[in-house]
Amino acid sequence: MAPSGLKAVVGEKILSGVIRSVKKDGEWKVLIMDHPSMRILSSCCKMSDILAEGITIVEDINKRREPIPSLEAIYLLSPTEKSVQALIXDFRGXPTXTYKAAHVFFTXTCPXPLFSEL
């Protein structure tokens, strides 16, 4: 049965269009979000649903995080200067980047000048 209600539809879109779109069997990922994205996700998805899709940890992009260079990260961000700069900073690390790879999704269309910074 298809999801009904706006929250259910948005939740399914996040699970299928973001998380499942990069999911590989037997491989865990880290989910990194900014505050607006976290509010969207927490209003329409249960943490158990997210963990069942192979997400091992959910973190705030604006808080200090330990590097996990063995795992790929899914970034679900608002298209803001602050969030894009935090994403860029994750891959400026020396000697290794914060994560193995980045799968980047924005909650709305990212303006061309901001996108070109990536």
Curated annotation (Swiss-Prot):
InterPro entries reported for this sequence: Sec-1-like_dom1, Sec1-like, Sec1-like_sf
GO biological process, one term: protein transport
Keywords annotated in UniProt: Exocytosis, Protein transport, Transport
Subunit structure, interactors included: Interacts with STX1A, STX2 and STX3. Interacts with STX11.
Role played: Involved in intracellular vesicle trafficking and vesicle fusion with membranes. Contributes to the granule exocytosis machinery through interaction with soluble N-ethylmaleimide-sensitive factor attachment protein receptor (SNARE) proteins that regulate membrane fusion. Regulates cytotoxic granule exocytosis in natural killer (NK) cells.
The family this protein is said to belong to: Belongs to the STXBP/unc-18/SEC1 family.
Protein name as annotated: Syntaxin-binding protein 2
